Amino acid sequence: MSKTKCALFDLDGTLVNTIDDLAGACEILIKKYNFDAHWTKEDYLNFVGNGAKKLVERAFNETLDEITLNERYEEFKPLYDKIKLDHAHAYDGIKEQLDVLKGMGIKLCVVTNKPNVAAVGMVEHIFGKNYFDCIIGCIDGIPTKPDPTSTFNALKKVGCKPSEAIFFGDSEVDMRTAKNAGIEAVGCSWGFRSFEILFAEHPSVIIDEPKYISKLF
């Protein structure tokens, strides 16, 4: 990993803890429609990772037809947008580690399944504008992770090869994204998935605290 020039990060569950606001928006929506569900925080931790539309689908227990799901998803977006920063915060030690990487000349990228506008807004609010070299969220017409397209787009933007990058993520989706892109995968077990789920994906290494990030460079 000594030749690494780029660090790619998932957003939700890796850089930023967003679960309370994601769950909150879903709860508002399912209560509006009197949907009989009593989800726990642990449930929502398992629902996230494949984008907001999939989150809504899982919150309604995958009972919605495609037309209704699209309608609910369109309702979810402004609900979440209103509260997305109420509780969201960077995990302890993340900013310090990112500063170390920047000092080493490492390119920093965010590759997330969160809608692009929401992703850019959140990252800039928490870390500052232009802190990251590249932020790529979910964009219509571009497949979401674990498809590697967004990851390849990020690498192209910063002028790096897959062999020069490490992908940090907290879920099986991220580990598969890295594998599909031919990139070293590092599991972050402080996020939304368990160590066991990450381990089953055979990443290069699993770290349980952000303080270990810079030690991989």
Which residue stretches match the model-derived regions?
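Asp-based, Mg2+/Mn2+-dependent phosphohydrolase catalytic module
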Residues: 1-5, 102, 116, 120-217
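Active-site neighborhood of HAD-like aspartate-dependent phosphohydrolases
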Residues: 1-46
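Generic enzyme active-site microenvironment
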Residues: 8-10, 111, 168
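Substrate-recognition element of Asp-dependent hydrolases with the DxDx(T/V) motif
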Residues: 26, 94-124
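Hydrophobic alpha-helical core bundles mediating ligand binding, dimerization, or RNAP-core interactions
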Residues: 26-30, 48, 52, 56, ...
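Short helix-capping segments at alpha-helix termini
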Residues: 32-37, 62-67, 103-104, 127-131, ...
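Alpha-helical substrate-recognition element adjacent to the catalytic core
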Residues: 32-63, 92
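Metal-dependent phosphoesterase signature
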Residues: 57-96, 104-106
